[in-house]
Amino acid sequence: MLKNINPTQTQAWKALTAHFESAQDMDMKELFAQDAKRFESFSTRFGSDILVDYSKNLIDAETMQHLFALANETEVKSAIEAMFGGDAINKTEGRSVLHTALRNRSDKPVMVDGKDVMPAVNAVLAKMELFTHRIVSGEWKGYTGKEITDVVNIGIGGSDLGPYMVTEALTPYKTRLNMHFVSNVDGTHIVETLKPLNPETTLFLVASKTFTTQETMTNAHSARDWFLAEAGDSAHVAKHFAALSTNAASVAEFGIDTDNMFEFWDWVGGRYSLWSAIGLSISLSIGFDNFAELLDGAHEMDNHFASTEFESNIPVILALIGVWYNNFHGAESEAILPYDQYMHRFAAYFQQGNMESNGKFVDREGNPVEYQTGPIIWGEPGTNGQHAFYQLIHQGTKLIPSDFIAPAISHNPASDHHQKLMSNFFAQTEALAFGKTKETVEAEFLAAGKTAEEVAELVPFKVFEGNRPTNSILVKQINPRSLGNLIAMYEHKIFVQGVIWNIFSFDQWGVELGKQLANQILPELADDAQVTSHDSSTNGLINAFKALKA
């Protein structure tokens, strides 16, 4: 079980607070000038294919020493052991947290309540493999005898974000199937997705553990109505729908053959579920062998995380640097910036992964915390972001630590595109770290023939202060295994930060109140009667909505 340790009461936190007083004056130019081996000292490799360079941060050896001490004092090691050991560390829901078991590629048992879960995990994987083969090979036929050509995954949150992110990131590995994802209860999403599709060749995956999720089931029923408008006979539903669920009764009532129901367990959190049956869309998209490679990659990072000393432990290092900025420098957000167009949903995926996990205001004893917890996560692929929001990162008043991620080898080596992309990748972190001084700007202007008056007027706007922190994560190539490495790396980073902040990272009660109120409001929208049961603003909005749609 996780211990209740207020990080601000630790000796390491107090030492970091004192250290920060002098560290505020750190200058990256000086840090690099003073240490010719700074890159070697503050970078590490994962295997032979991933390099993590954290040298362009406002840290020195003393900073890291205090941060590692903080990890020790908050008992991160015992927390890691508790998670991998199947302890019910999701205390508010009384559940173990074992997404790591889903990608356990060893022969080691994983125990929950005295029972090894691995036989069940491997049975579902075997079922997914067979199903994937039947669909991709064309053996599975629709109700008119045609092969499936399109797969629509209907889910929301973890049942959508993860599979969508991975299938996009691994597009170069796709099978012949066309993948589609529907999540929003806005009817536009399902209607526009279905417009070009043929009911005879479309398979739907309904991803809902309980088979009661409002958004998912609303979309699933609309998909079934669309299908039956063409197919007619409800018996045909079984050839075109499968379920990722544990509610066999509701699945059968919907018309799905329970032989095509793929289960997962309550120790699998939604935002960590792509490794489970929820990943069936991934398996169909890239083939089961590649899905297994994705699991292998995550398992490699799990082993690294569980067994490596903190000083060389990549998720721990990244987590601690994040704590340094969040709790001492006052940074409120972090950017994730993949220089790979296929990874265009990577930041959005970890926006959920991080903000739903660590967006908490009470500690593990239920008391309000007096320090900052999870940051805001955002980002877009490079180079698009450079022409959108990098201005603020470079010259704004907010400190925004940023992760730059890029592959050395492109899947599309057209002309010199990748060299140009990577030149921007390297240039941005250099510019953020070292900036451009007033003197350099003046010299450039004078060399360009500007007058003294022009120089004096324009120089302040051209100065880059630098000292903007970044991590650079260089990957040989984005493939199923390396993507598995990266996803697990960020998952474990988030976990470590939650341990240090003394919060529960695996529940998400913050999503409940809005759903509860929506269920109360829904019947009130059924007629034109004036609503008076809420506050004046909500009443006014509902009544204005009714008037506008009349």
Swiss-Prot record:
EC number: 5.3.1.9
One annotated Gene Ontology cellular component of this protein: cytosol
Biological process according to GO: gluconeogenesis; glucose 6-phosphate metabolic process; glycolytic process
Database matches in Gene3D superfamilies: 1.10.1390.10, Glucose-6-phosphate isomerase like protein, domain 1
Location of the protein in the cell: Cytoplasm
Reactions it catalyzes: alpha-D-glucose 6-phosphate = beta-D-fructose 6-phosphate
Keyword annotations from UniProtKB, A to Z: Cytoplasm, Gluconeogenesis, Glycolysis, Isomerase
Annotated InterPro entries: G6P_Isomerase (IPR001672), G6P_Isomerase_C (IPR023096), Phosphoglucose_isomerase_CS (IPR018189), SIS_dom_sf (IPR046348), SIS_PGI_1 (IPR035476), SIS_PGI_2 (IPR035482)
A Pfam family that the UniProt record links to this protein: PGI
NCBIfam families assigned to the protein according to its UniProt record, in alphabetical order: PRK00179.1
Name recorded for this polypeptide: Glucose-6-phosphate isomerase
Lineage: Bacteria, Pseudomonadati, Pseudomonadota, Gammaproteobacteria, Vibrionales
Gene name, Swiss-Prot/TrEMBL: pgi
